[in-house]
Amino acid sequence: MLDPALLRQHPADLAERLRSTRGFALDTAKLESLESERKHMQVRTQELQSLRNSKSKAIGQAKAKGEDVAALMAEVAGVGDELLHSHGRLTVVQHELEKIYAVIPNLPHADVPLGKSEADNVEQSRWGTPRQFDFPVKDHVELGAPNGWLDGETAVKLSGARFTVLRGPIARLHRALAQFMLDLHVGEHGYEETNVPLLVNADSMRGTGQLPKFEDDLFRIYENEYEGHTDEETGESFYTPTGGVDPDPAYYLIPTSEVPLTNIVRDEIIDAERLPLRMTAHSMCFRAEAGSGGRDTRGMIRQHQFEKVELVTACAPEDSDAEHQRMTRCAEVVLEQLGLPYRKVLLCTGDMGFSAIKTYDLEVWLPSQNTYREISSCSNCGDFQARRMQARWRNPVSGKLELLHTLNGSGTAVGRAMIAVMENYQNADGSIDVPQVLRPYMGGIERIG
């Protein structure tokens, strides 16, 4: 969330910046009208509270003197009614303002190039040279399906579209990749391994910015409503379903472990000595892919359920730029140790995520598509998420509480890494060489198939 003070002080300037960089239309007239009413209702509520307190004090003094207090009590009752109305309206106005604040995207860093789509992203560097094949290249489906290692048909029977069943050596390769990534980030990059829930509450989703804007892309878990009873003989309590369902989701399936990892610092005050906090987790991720249409329907490129190794950092504001470079480099090392050609891209203003001020994407080379595809996205979110979460640290110089900066990145997507390994390490006979760094995780196997 942007600083409400900035929105109050410079609404027109911020509206123009949001329009030109994010394509976001801020209704400044509505914002200023609500802010004016908020100020008025806040002053009026405080005046009424003061008036009620003074009249209540007068009642006590009058009673002590034995005077009739009926008129004063009637006045206090009237003030109380007006206070109730004033406070209620203030609450409504504040809620309306919060709804506006909640859907405003973060402002890009000055280094971020202006643009509307991925076509305007700026390539920063490349690593590795794409392999030249002397035989027809197969995609990951053609490599995995004939042996039953990659089974989309069974997944459709079990669940539906955009799911995959992995078997045998490909399932083992998938697991090996996740283990390799975790070991690298924990053992060499200094991240703390963390095991997080896959189900989180709405506060967690709001904290990292998934709610309210992206609710349609989330899987929601609803709870049945129950009615309480007491056994007349034993006195024990028990519950039976009413047949109804609670209208609000009890939980959300995480779209990325960024959500639970980042929310670990929600409502916390972190000592400066503990910073930076660097955390990593390997988890399932779940996305409805509501806006993906018919894109990437073949194979495992875009799934409802997939696995990812996530990197999250919480740090002091002055360190976030350096931490962003460091995090991105940690993800690059994964691809380099796997021997996968990739390129690093700086996202333009129109292609960045909602919460980010600056994002680097790493795109891995897929021979079957003759192009680079995203495998990691590393973002600096500044204090945007921290303000929503009230995640703070105590500045040892000033002694004051300040908002943390939060960062997140994929280190990397496991399924896409598996696809890249399969395609880049394929042989003419359909077999797949196992990258050197993965062989200890594969029982020494050097080739699949």
From Swiss-Prot:
Domain of life assignment: Bacteria
BP GO terms, sorted: selenocysteine biosynthetic process; seryl-tRNA aminoacylation
Record has Lipoprotein as a keyword: no
Single GO MF descriptor: ATP binding
Catalytic activity: tRNA(Ser) + L-serine + ATP = L-seryl-tRNA(Ser) + AMP + diphosphate + H(+); tRNA(Sec) + L-serine + ATP = L-seryl-tRNA(Sec) + AMP + diphosphate + H(+)
UniProt cross-references to HAMAP family, sorted A to Z: Ser_tRNA_synth_type1 (MF_00176)
Name of the molecule in the record: Serine--tRNA ligase
Species the sequence originates in: Xanthomonas oryzae pv. oryzae (strain MAFF 311018)
